[in-house]
A protein has these predicted regions:
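Short secondary-structure transition/capping segments
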Residues: 72-73, 98-100, 154-159
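Conserved Lys-Pro-Asp/Glu-containing loop-to-beta segment of HAD-superfamily phosphomonoesterases
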Residues: 3, 102-128, 134
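Alpha-helical substrate-recognition element adjacent to the catalytic core
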Residues: 2-96
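Acidic, Mg2+-coordinating phosphoryl-transfer loop and its flanking beta/alpha structural elements
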Residues: 118-164
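Surface-exposed amphipathic alpha-helices with a cationic face
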Residues: 51-55, 110, 135
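A structural preference for long, well-packed, hydrophobic secondary-structure segments
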Residues: 94-117, 141-149
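Glycine-centered loop/turn motif at secondary-structure junctions
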Residues: 58, 81, 114, 138-140
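Short, aromatic/basic amphipathic alpha-helical patches
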Residues: 73-81, 109, 132-138
């Protein structure tokens, strides 16, 4: 059986509308992203060609969302017709960078669960660094994203000044 790996936020789930809910005043990432993750069940799906019923592969989902949001995440996947075989989520209060986190997920899939890496047809993610990591490990990978709004960098403070003439 062949496998594809899908990222969730901004790859198959359109999270752009909830990025404004990230509380950049919070130092703790769990608190910072709580409202953002809590609203994920209301996302619209995107890049549906990656998971529609014509996709002949088993779907494995790698997401940086904490396990605390596991039930609504699994429900969203099912409600949107994403027939996933496995869902990998970060441990609660684990703030590991996405690239390293997904590398660990891949190691667990291959070494821990005995999946032949040759069966992985492609891994899709919205982040260039994650896609490069997959490629360096011999996994075909492609960047697929729905939008270009970053959920990892606080928006810059723009100061507008008005000059009177």
């Amino acid at each position: 059986v062949s496998i594809i790996i899908l990222d969730l936020d901004n790859c198959i789930a359109n999270d752009e509308w909830r990025i404004k809910e990230i509380d950049w005043e919070q130092d703790n990432p769990t608190a910072r992203y709580h409202n953002y993750h809590g609203l994920a069940a209301f996302d619209e799906p995107g890049n549906t060609d990656l998971f529609n019923c014509l996709v002949p592969h088993d779907i494995v989902v790698f997401t940086a969302r904490p396990k605390f949001y596991g039930a609504p995440t699994a429900e969203w996947l099912k409600r949107n017709g994403i027939n996933f075989s496995l869902l990998f989520m970060r441990d609660n209060n684990d703030h590991t960078h996405s690239k390293e986190l997904k590398r660990r997920f891949l190691v667990e899939l291959i070494q821990g669960m005995g999946v032949d890496p040759g069966k992985i047809v492609c891994a899709y993610d919205d982040r260039d660094d994650v896609v490069e990591m997959y490629k360096k490990l011999g996994i075909p990978a492609e960047v697929r994203k729905i939008h270009d709004t970053c959920a990892y960098t606080a928006p810059s403070k723009i100061l507008l000044t008005h000059q009177e003439q």
